[in-house]
Design a protein with these regions (language model features):
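ABC-type ATPase nucleotide-binding domains, specifically the catalytic core motifs of the NBD
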Residues: 16, 72, 97-115, 123-128, ...
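Catalytic Walker B motif of ABC-type/P-loop ATPase nucleotide-binding domains
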Residues: 159-163
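Conserved ABC transporter NBD signature motif
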Residues: 60-69, 80, 113-115
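ABC ATPase C-loop
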Residues: 151-152
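Helix-to-loop junction immediately C-terminal to a conserved catalytic motif
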Residues: 52
Length: 238
């Protein structure tokens, strides 16, 4: 059995008085991809916010490699090896591609050097070709590559990816998929929030389905593929 990389355990979370996560539990194993899927508004991005310390839970626990990190500030959770690629491609639009990566690398407190600015360029040749361009001049797909690269130069052990394929052309989605598969092969643990069900099933080893803030399915990808009723009921597709 894979070592537990990141776990949410019986999480209750609120936005003001709205109970948005109810006893949510799931674990991403070491060097495995956990696909976190569900309809819009199910609570997937909220789980990401809880995991990285942006939204402290009202109850429950977050653990990184069995170390409790619940209610630690985001920078402390990052120091335990957790990085987030958020929705919206949060990059410094007024900096060049190289400057974006260099700033993220300098901010890392982990000390590892597996991923450097140059190794990101090797993984994403398009970024190398545009290293002196402002991030604001990149296409949407290139900005997503840059957001992933910024997370990687922190050299995390756990990578959380929130809708990495959203709004991208099929060719760029294929590039992102290859990168995720490569990262898993290199031992990185990944939690993947993904609306593209086909992509999620292709990349994930394990699946958690959220519906109205609750986990309604937790199992392997193969187990979900054999359960059309669950897919139809909670995702609205066959």
């Amino acid at each position: 059995m894979a070592r537990r990389a990141i776990s949410l355990i019986d999480i209750d979370a609120y936005y003001s008085d709205s109970h948005v996560l109810q006893r949510v539990s799931f674990t991403a194993g070491e060097a495995r991809v956990l696909g976190l899927i569900g309809r819009n508004g199910a609570g997937k991005s909220t789980c990401m916010s809880v995991a990285v310390g942006l939204l402290p839970p009202r109850a429950g626990a977050v653990e990184v490699f069995d170390v409790p990190v619940t209610r630690l500030p985001p920078e402390s959770i990052a120091a335990h090896g957790v990085a987030l690629v958020p929705q919206g491609r949060r990059i410094f639009r007024s900096l060049t591609v190289r400057e974006n990566l260099a700033v993220a690398a300098r901010a890392s407190t982990l000390g590892a050097t597996h991923w450097t600015v140059d190794s990101v360029f090797a993984a994403f040749p398009r970024l190398k070709e545009r290293e002196r361009q402002l991030a604001s001049q990149l296409s949407g797909g290139e900005q997503q590559m840059l957001a992933i690269g910024r997370a990687l130069v922190a050299n995390p052990r756990v990578l959380l990816m929130d809708e990495p394929s959203e709004g991208l052309a099929p060719q760029i989605v294929a590039d992102v998929a290859r990168t995720i598969a490569r990262l898993k092969g290199e031992g990185l643990s990944i939690v993947l929030v993904e609306q593209n069900l086909r992509l999620a099933l292709e990349l994930a080893d394990d699946i958690a389905i959220l519906n109205s803030g609750r986990v309604v399915f937790l199992g392997t990808t193969d187990e979900l593929k054999g359960n059309d009723a669950i897919i139809a009921r909670h995702l609205g597709v066959y």
